């Protein structure tokens, strides 16, 4: 595309006046050097010049500017408009509850694993071995959930328990008891208001949510969990005894299992109602 005829060039500054001859000389000495590299070297050499060495070029630039203003009194510099870059939006394929923004911002690898499982349920990214064996899929999802929500020590123990229980025919029933044996190494861990898991692959992710509930109970020092009367999918961690006591504590967290709708939240399970 040819430039318009009435285009007026900007007046040269002191560096441009000095670099005219220097650029031509350097291009002759280095014919294969790119123009950007030549400009970079010329800029470094210009900074090394003293004020007395720059003075003649500064005076010449002032003279050229005065001549330019006399020839083009209505001249106005109009820079080229650069296209605005589109802002990139953060996309999370794995549902992250409130209070875990730092984990999402840090691009936690376990979140990427959860995103892969979530996308694979509908897009075929999950290996066929995991689809054929829901026990192994449950163990893998439980380990990924433990790495996100619990410290490294508790997460390692949870992953080991899930892997050990995956080979047993009663793994889903025995996984909670194995997870309860983990020592409470992170008693100060805050609970999220709700933990949302993907609804695809109910058999595999049911075991994952059960493992996460057991890990939450072990981390917080709870002895067992109660199912909510309104929906058995809600597991409430609790450390109440068989006999009623005045120091009963309210539930600390609700864990939503896949395939269950969100009912009216019941703050106290049937055990509390019977005790009262």
Curated annotation (Swiss-Prot):
Annotated DNA-binding ranges? 8-76
The name of this protein is: Transcription factor SOX-21
**A biological-process GO annotation:** regulation of transcription by RNA polymerase II
Query: Which GO cellular component does the record give, naming just one?
Result: chromatin
Pfam hit, one: HMG_box
> Which InterPro entries does this UniProt record tie to the protein?
HMG_box_dom, HMG_box_dom_sf, SOX_fam, SRY-related_HMG-box_TF-like
Keyword set, alphabetical order: Activator, DNA-binding, Nucleus, Transcription, Transcription regulation
| Source species taxonomy | Eukaryota, Metazoa, Chordata, Craniata, Vertebrata
* Species, as recorded: Homo sapiens
> Which terms does the record give in the GO molecular function aspect?
DNA binding; DNA-binding transcription activator activity, RNA polymerase II-specific; DNA-binding transcription factor activity; DNA-binding transcription factor activity, RNA polymerase II-specific; RNA polymerase II cis-regulatory region sequence-specific DNA binding
Question: Could you tell me which PANTHER family the record lists for this protein?
Answer: SOX TRANSCRIPTION FACTOR (PTHR10270), TRANSCRIPTION FACTOR SOX-21 (PTHR10270:SF313)
UniProt keyword annotation of Nucleus present: yes
Q: Which PROSITE patterns match?
A: HMG_BOX_2 (PS50118)
Location relative to the cell: Nucleus
What is known about what this protein does?
Answer: May play a role as an activator of transcription of OPRM1. Overexpression of SOX21 can up-regulate the OPRM1 distal promoter activity in mor-expressing neuronal cells. May play a role in ameloblast differentiation.
Any transmembrane segments, and where? none
């Amino acid at each position: 595309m040819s430039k318009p005829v009435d285009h007026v060039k900007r007046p040269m500054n002191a560096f441009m006046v000095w670099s005219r001859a220097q650029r031509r000389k350097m291009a002759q000495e280095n014919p294969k050097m790119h123009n950007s590299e030549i400009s970079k070297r010329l800029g470094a050499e210009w900074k090394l010049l003293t004020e007395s060495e720059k003075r003649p070029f500064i005076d010449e630039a002032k003279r050229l500017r005065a001549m330019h203003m006399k020839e083009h009194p209505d001249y106005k510099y109009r820079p080229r408009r650069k296209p605005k870059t589109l802002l990139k939006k953060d996309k999370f394929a794995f549902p992250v509850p409130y209070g875990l923004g730092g984990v999402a911002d840090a691009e936690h690898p376990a979140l990427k694993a959860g995103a892969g499982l979530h996308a694979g349920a509908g897009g075929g990214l999950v290996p066929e071995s995991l689809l054929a064996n829901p026990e192994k899929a449950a163990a893998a999802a439980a380990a990924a959930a433990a790495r996100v929500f619990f410290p490294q020590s508790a997460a390692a123990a949870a992953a080991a328990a899930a892997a050990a229980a995956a080979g047993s025919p009663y793994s889903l029933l025995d996984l909670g008891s194995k997870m309860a044996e983990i020592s409470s190494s992170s008693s100060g861990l805050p609970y999220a208001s709700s933990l949302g898991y993907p609804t695809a692959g109910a058999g595999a992710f049911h075991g994952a949510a059960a493992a996460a509930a057991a890990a939450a109970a072990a981390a917080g020092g709870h002895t067992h969990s109660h199912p909510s009367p309104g929906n058995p999918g809600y597991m409430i961690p609790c450390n109440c005894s068989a006999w009623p006591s005045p120091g009963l504590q309210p539930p600390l967290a609700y864990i939503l299992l896949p395939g269950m709708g969100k009912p009216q939240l019941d703050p106290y399970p049937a055990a509390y109602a019977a005790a009262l």
